[in-house]
Design a protein with these regions (language model features):
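Membrane-embedded beta-strand positions in outer-membrane beta-barrel channels/transporters
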Residues: 77, 142-144, 188, 291, ...
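Periplasmic alpha-helical coiled-coil/stalk elements that build and connect Gram-negative outer-membrane
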Residues: 171, 175-293, 405, 409-412, ...
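A short glycine-centered flexible hinge/capping loop motif at secondary-structure junctions
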Residues: 219-223, 434-438, 475
Length: 489
């Protein structure tokens, strides 16, 4: 075969391969972007693997904890504020709004743009009875300056609105920290309650096993019946069942705390135990004082106030549309030209050119668009102001409920302490009487169940005081303030 034909065949093969590759790639993209073919089973497409790989790339390494250290609540809160992704989201949003304010403020300054142009044109020109080759070169530096001299407040309205929106984003950032702190406190106290319930459940199991052992000994001496022993075994099995339930709740509490800290649930975290904490008996605060603080410092309420300021600034911007705006434009140009024509010497010239203009813009008629935009902006202001009143009522009610819950928890703590002491004495007396044959086994198991419930109630009451105290600080907005402003128990 002729070499040219071989080259032609090879070229056609390459073209066919390229066409097949393009068509297959296009088909794969079409399949990847196609909707599920039917509603009766899940979709699995070609793009699923790539998305799954991208999803794995967003995984961050978990926090590392010292296994020998018991972390206190302030240390856990510091870790949560540093590593919980919610604070990062709120922070980036605040930075975005701050940048938007900077963009709005840039309207106070002129806009200056520079451009450099260079070109060469070569061709033939006809002069007299012949053509001559001609070369013309051009080099220009152009500055374009634009500035709004006045617009009757439209620019100022946009700047004020952007500033208020940046302020609202900062308050939202603070509110995110308030929520993260409260979630960490809740998870910590939930874990303390679960750990305390585990201790109580193990003590209950130990008591039930002691009762079972006493029943077995009495049965071996003919002083008890088989039903008594079966009742004791049933109580021990019930105590074991309750212990396993408590262990499961403790695992969940560990996961909740890890989630609040911004790490994976299986992270091992040792925390300061409940017995090392001081449980307050009273609180040196009044509900009126807590309400006043909440209405003055709650970041979500302050965010609402900033929203009102932004809405009012938008009204100012909307009103400015009824008035003219004056713009100034200048475009100085430095130009350099040179030329060469056949049989003639080079020619060159340079100079300053350009222009300037004032432009007055005034919308005379727009089909009531300005009127409706102004009405819309004013309605947004009224809505935002009404939302503040709604938020104030909600905050006052939240503080009232949190304060009431705290007082209730303090009273229940006193009752739980007395209940535990009485139940412990009752159980000891019942078991001793049973060993002497003065009480039956039903009395002992009943006392044992009462003691178990009293232990559980005591743990719950102690952690409930701490939880409700944290809730009051959360509702009043004290958790993100300086320590000097927080209520002291």
């Amino acid at each position: 075969m002729h070499p040219s034909r071989l080259r032609s065949s090879a070229a056609r093969a390459v073209v066919r391969a390229a066409i097949v590759l393009i068509l297959s790639h296009g088909a794969s993209l079409a399949l990847a972007q196609r909707a599920p073919v039917s509603p009766d089973h899940p979709w699995h497409g070609l793009g699923e693997a790539r998305i799954e790989a991208d999803a794995r790339n967003f995984t961050e390494p978990g926090l590392s904890f010292d296994r020998e250290k018991a972390y206190s609540l302030p240390e856990l809160i510091d870790l949560a504020e540093s590593h919980n992704p919610e604070t990062r989201v709120a922070w980036e949003h605040a930075r975005t709004q701050a940048a938007a304010w900077g963009v709005a403020r840039s309207e106070l300054y002129p806009t200056v743009a520079a451009a450099a142009l260079a070109g060469v044109d070569r061709g033939q020109v006809y002069l007299a009875d012949r053509f001559f080759r001609q070369t013309i070169g051009d080099f220009e530096v152009v500055l374009n300056l634009n500035y709004t001299i006045f617009d009757f407040g439209a620019r100022a309205g946009r700047i004020s609105a952007a500033k208020a929106e940046a302020l609202a984003a900062n308050f939202a950032f603070n509110d995110t920290h308030r929520s993260v702190i409260y979630r960490t406190e809740q998870a910590y106290y939930q874990l303390l309650n679960a750990s305390g319930q585990e201790e109580a459940a193990r003590a209950n199991l130990s008591n039930a096993q002691a009762v079972q052992q006493a029943a077995e000994e009495r049965l071996s001496h003919g002083l008890a019946t088989l039903p008594d022993l079966l009742e004791a075994r049933s109580a021990a099995a019930q105590a074991e069942y309750e212990l396993q339930a408590v262990l499961g709740a403790e695992e969940i509490a560990h996961g909740n705390l890890a989630n609040a800290l911004g790490t994976i649930p299986q992270t091992a975290i040792r925390v300061q135990p409940l017995r090392e904490l001081t449980i307050p008996g009273t609180i040196d605060d009044t509900v009126n004082s807590a309400m006043d603080r909440a209405l003055a410092q709650r970041p979500d309420l302050l965010q609402r106030v900033a929203d009102v300021q932004a809405a009012k600034a938008r009204v100012k911007e909307a009103r400015a549309a009824y008035y003219p705006s004056l713009n100034f434009t200048a475009s100085p140009t430095v130009q350099s030209l040179y030329g060469l024509q056949q049989q003639f010497p080079w020619g060159q010239t340079a100079g300053l050119a350009g222009g300037m203009a004032f432009k007055l813009n005034w919308t005379v008629f727009d089909g009531k668009a300005r009127k409706n935009r102004l009405a819309q902006a004013e309605a947004i202001v009224h809505e935002a102001e009404a939302q503040i009143r709604v938020s104030r009522d909600q905050i006052a009610n939240e503080v009232w409920a949190a304060y009431s819950d705290l007082n209730t928890a303090l009273r229940q703590r006193e009752a739980a302490t007395a209940l535990l002491e009485a139940a412990g004495r009752s159980y000891d007396a019942a078991l001793e009487s049973y060993n002497y044959g003065l009480r039956n086994l039903l009395d002992v198991t009943a006392a044992q169940r009462t003691l178990a419930q009293a232990r559980s109630t005591d743990v719950l009451a102690r952690t409930q005081v701490l939880t409700t105290l944290a809730a009051l600080a959360f509702r009043a907005g004290d958790s993100i303030q300086s320590n000097a402003m927080k209520p002291r128990p």
